[in-house]
Design a protein with these regions (language model features):
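Subtilisin-like serine protease catalytic core
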Residues: 75-87, 92-105, 114-164
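Short intrinsically disordered, low-complexity coil segments enriched in acidic
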Residues: 1, 165-166
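N-terminal substrate-binding region of glycoside hydrolase catalytic domains
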Residues: 111
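Bacterial N-terminal signal peptides that target proteins for export
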Residues: 1-8
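Protease zymogen maturation seam
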Residues: 11-85, 98-99
Length: 166
């Protein structure tokens, strides 16, 4: 072996025997508390008015569908059904419904509610797919998960200042 090859091999063995340097904890950056905005409850930026009728609640009788059959949920549920987890549905709100027993109010940026009103129906449908209670016809992916309802938009409400005069 040539001298340079022996030096390279020795250096490689030395490097491998020492190993990588340990990770170091990095302290979070300092926060200037004076620069933070004051805490406030969720609310729209101004007064709002309802401009359309709310959609009705979901039908009492759900027809069997194959929408989620490819997920094969019964094989996953022994591992987890979402218990102890919380999912925020930030949408058009989530209406209280018997198939959403773990619904929690989270806030309303559209009107003066708590997020558990849904005039558009979209947020409620999304929450049902995530955590709808199982029936013989349908179940959400994680039926034991908590759902926090946050209404951030609605086609049925407008800021009063945005309404054109009649």
């Amino acid at each position: 072996m040539t001298r340079s090859l022996r030096v390279v091999a020795t250096m490689a063995l030395l490097h491998l025997s020492i190993g990588p340097s340990p990770a170091r904890a990095v302290a979070p950056p300092p926060v200037d508390r004076a620069a933070l905005p004051a805490a406030s409850s969720p609310a729209p930026p101004g007064p709002t008015e309802q401009t359309g009728r709310c959609v009705g609640s979901a039908p009492a009788r759900i027809t069997r569908g194959e929408q989620l059959s490819s997920l094969n949920l019964p094989t996953v549920w022994p591992l987890s059904r979402g218990s102890g987890q919380l999912v925020a549905v930030i949408d058009t709100g989530v209406a209280r419904h018997r198939l959403l027993p773990h619904l929690l109010p989270g806030g309303d940026f559209v009107s003066s509610g708590d997020g558990t009103q849904d005039c558009d129906g979209h947020g409620t449908a999304v929450a049902g797919l995530i955590g709808g209670a199982p029936t013989s016809e349908f179940s959400g992916v994680a039926p034991d998960v908590g759902i926090m309802a946050i209404r951030q938009s609605s086609n049925k409400f407008r800021l009063t200042s945005d309404l054109s005069p009649d």
